[in-house]
From Swiss-Prot:
F-type ATPases have 2 components, CF(1) - the catalytic core - and CF(0) - the membrane proton channel. CF(1) has five subunits: alpha(3), beta(3), gamma(1), delta(1), epsilon(1). CF(0) has three main subunits: a(1), b(2) and c(9-12). The alpha and beta chains form an alternating ring which encloses part of the gamma chain. CF(1) is attached to CF(0) by a central stalk formed by the gamma and epsilon chains, while a peripheral stalk is formed by the delta and b chains. This is ATP synthase subunit a. GO terms for biological process: proton motive force-driven plasma membrane ATP synthesis. Belongs to the ATPase A chain family. Keywords: ATP synthesis, Cell inner membrane, Cell membrane, CF(0), Hydrogen ion transport, Ion transport, Membrane, Transmembrane, Transmembrane helix, Transport. The keyword Phosphoprotein does not apply. It comes from Paracidovorax citrulli (strain AAC00-1) (Acidovorax citrulli). GO terms for molecular function: proton-transporting ATP synthase activity, rotational mechanism. It is found in: Cell inner membrane. Key component of the proton channel; it plays a direct role in the translocation of protons across the membrane. InterPro entries: ATP_syn_F0_a_bact/chloroplast, ATP_synth_F0_asu, ATP_synth_F0_asu_AS, F0_ATP_A_sf. The keyword Cell inner membrane applies.
Amino acid sequence: MAAEAHAPTASEYIVHHLQHLQNIKQKSIVDFSVVNIDSVVVGLVLGAIALFAFWLCARKATSGVPGRFQAAVEILVEMVDNQAKANIHNAESRKFIAPLALTVFVWIFLMNAMDMLPVDLLPAIWAQIYGAAGHDPHHAYLRVVPTADLSTTLGLSTAVLVLCLYYSVKIKGLGGWAHELVTAPFGTSKNPVFALILGVVNLLMQIIEYVAKTVSHGMRLFGNMYAGELVFMLIALMGGAAAMSLSGVLLPVGHIIAGSIWAIFHILVITLQAFIFMMLALIYLGQAHEAH
C-alpha cells in the first residue's frame, strides 16, 4: 500500500523525466546562467567516442580489402564529401567544411541514438548514485538525449550561423558583404531617398532571414527528438500500467508492439534528422559563398 501511495502519476513521471540536471534551478524561460549539465556531459562523451572510433578506423585502415567497419566509414565519408562538393564549390573551403559536416552528422546521430536506450535505464542508475551520495533520489534528474534539449540544438545552429558570417566576409570581403546586406533582395535605386528606404528594408529582411534560418535549423531537430522522447515515455507508461494492473491484460501486448514499431521507425528518424541538419548546414554555408 505504501509503495502504491508513493507511485508517481503519469504526469509526474513525464515531468520528472523532462527535468534536466542543472547547475542552478531555472527561474525563467530564458536564463543564460543555467547550464544543463546532463546535455553537456553526454554530448562531450559521445563526441569523444566518435573521435576515438574514427581514430581507430584510421589507425587500422588498409589499402587492401577493407573490413566491415572501414568500409562503412568509407561509404559515410564519400557520401558526405559528395554532398559537400554539390553545395560548396570553393575547393579551399571544402577542406574544412567537409570534415566539419562529417563530424556534425556523426555527432548528432550519436546524440539522437541515445533515445533508443530504455527510458528509465540511465536515470535509474543515476538515481542510485545520487541516493548513495546522501541526496534524495526523487530529485535525481537526468535527460540523456542532448538533441532533445533546445539549448543544444540552438547552440549548434548558432555555430553554423557564425560560420556563415565568417565565410560571407572571407569570400566577399567586408565591404562586399555589407553592400549585399543593404542591396538584397530588393536591389537599390539611383534616387538617394529610395536607396535609403530600400537599404533599410533590405537590411531588415537580411536580419530576419539569418534569424529565421538559425531558429528553424535548431528547432527542427529539437522538435523531432523531443516528440520522440515523449512517445517513448508514453510507451514506458503502458508497461508501468500493465505492471500495476491485473485487469489490463492487453497492456503488456500493446506495450511490446507499440515499443517495437516506434523503435524501428525511430531508427529512421534519428538518422534522417542528423542528415537533414548536416545538409542544411552545407546549404547555408554554400549560400554564404554565393553573391545575391
